Amino acid sequence: MAKIEKSIIIDAPVEDVFNYVEDPGNIPEYWPSVIEIKDVEDLPNGGARMTSVYKMAGVRFDVESVCTEYVPNQRTVYESEGGVSSTATWIYEPHDGGTKATIRNEYTVELPVLRKLAESFLVKMNENEADAILANVKAKMEA
């Protein structure tokens, strides 16, 4: 299992960043490999269950995700299965009037076609994607 953790400082209130990131309809705006979100179901814990349609390394696949932890304006955890099994955690912390947003993703690639890619290539690709996700959220929130 690979693990990636990245953070960024955003000049916007924690509540605004949290609400933007945690709205499933916004995910394709900031997550480069997600091309569609479908079958969204609100959960009693405040989070959601959804299907994310990904395209990675030219391969399209669906990932089913469910929010297992939802602490408004602080933290969410999503467990996902499909082409990739992962635990994605978002952490939101106040920082000098803005927000420190951290994404932590632990994952295992399940699709044989993707597994054939060199592991170091996949890790680097996902590290770059985490950087892009955070930069996209920052750009949207600071616009």
Model-identified regions with their sequence ranges:
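Hydrophobic-ligand-binding modules of eukaryotic lipid transfer/binding families
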Residues: M1-I9, D131, A135, A143
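Hydrophobic ligand-binding cavity/cleft-lining segments
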Residues: M1-N45
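Solvent-exposed residues in well-ordered beta-strands and their adjoining turns
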Residues: I9-P13, V53-A57, T68-Y70, E93-H95, ...
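Glycine-rich portal/gate segments that line the openings of hydrophobic small-molecule binding cavities
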Residues: K38-T87, D96-K100, A132-A143
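Beta-strand/loop substructures that line and gate deep hydrophobic ligand-binding cavities in soluble
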Residues: E79-A132
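A generic structural signal for secondary-structure junctions
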Residues: P32, A118-L122, E142
